[in-house]
Amino acid sequence: MSQQKQQLTENQIIEHYKDLKSQQQQIISRISEFESDVGEYGLVINAIQNLESNRKCFRMVGGVLVERTVGEVLPQIKQNRDGIKEVVKKLDENLSIKTKELNDFVALYKIKITSQ
């Protein structure tokens, strides 16, 4: 690592730091979006779970409004919500890795953040 440390110029260090920080912010943004989606799915599930399973409902599929029953839609919505939760877990793991990478980089080059 010390050879790599010596090979990077100040501008390269700054750019690499900015890239790492940007990647971290992108992951945070995606987590936020997906958590919002999970919340919306939860609202829909709460709204329709007590309805009769043969009751008519509509769902947007690929930009087309499709008529289904609550019994058909509810399991699909729960499955989608659970899939999004898994994606959030993986993104949380990625965020932890990226944060550690960023902190290690800051420690290696003794970067001090000053507010502008």
UniProtKB/Swiss-Prot annotation:
The answer on whether this UniProt entry bears the keyword Ligase reads no
Family matches, as CDD domains: Prefoldin_2
Q: Does the keyword Chaperone apply?
A: yes
Signal sequence region: none
BP-aspect Gene Ontology terms: positive regulation of cytoskeleton organization; protein folding
What this chain does, per the record?
Binds specifically to cytosolic chaperonin (c-CPN) and transfers target proteins to it. Binds to nascent polypeptide chain and promotes folding in an environment in which there are many competing pathways for nonnative proteins.
The subunit structure is: Heterohexamer of two PFD-alpha type and four PFD-beta type subunits.
What's the protein name?
Probable prefoldin subunit 2
